[in-house]
Amino acid sequence: MNLPAAHIERIRDLGYTDSEARFLYIVAVFSGYFTLGQFRLFTGSAYGKRPTSFAQKLLKQGHATVRDYMRRGSIYHLFSRTVYGQIEKDNLRNRKKHSFDFMRTRLVLLDFILANQELAYFETEQDKVSFFSEQLGVSKDFLPAKVYEGSSRTQPTIRYFVDKFPLFLASPVSGAPPVVTLSYVDSGFETPSHFVSHSVLPASS
């Protein structure tokens, strides 16, 4: 994963260390939610001053909120427009409040990202659409999409890859050229029908 140095520097300008800034960038782009356990995993730190100081800094500056997570700890939501604005992604839905199932899915998704940092991820909807339509020549008609109806005065909006699950380049076997890989993240509460509807989206769009 290649994190843009300019964006990391801008997050550092808000008072964060380099490792904190890199972690916050990953959270902002891919999840919006995280636990201090995930922060400790990313930074290689133990329980104690470092994660506590990081959490206090986030809350004091109003960059995140915290809530109880299934009575097993706390879950943090990085919501501040200031942070997202520093990386030119203040329109991401990760900033918004979501259901518990959504948060759980995003935590599982972040676990995957942190465990596979060597992969080349497509960060945004536009990155994904551009890769398929411009580099691979795939018509947008065949991309997974959802139509959002507007008001009587506005046109419907078509959004692509709305699940925002990780999409990345990876080699199927050692030494082979990388291929684009789509993923599905199960929060643990989904029904089989949800996976089926997800898996057939590309064919039905």
Predicted regions located by residue number:
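Exposed, interaction-prone assembly regions rather than primary DNA-binding/catalytic cores
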Residues: 99-194
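Short, amphipathic alpha-helical interaction segments positioned at domain boundaries
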Residues: 80-107
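Detector for Asparagine
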Residues: 2, 91-94, 116
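Basic, Lys/Arg-rich alpha-helical nucleic-acid-recognition elements, primarily the DNA-binding modules
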Residues: 1-86
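Nucleic-acid nuclease catalytic cores
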Residues: 205
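Glycine-rich, often proline-containing surface loops adjacent to acidic residues and nearby aromatics
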Residues: 33-35, 86-94, 175-183
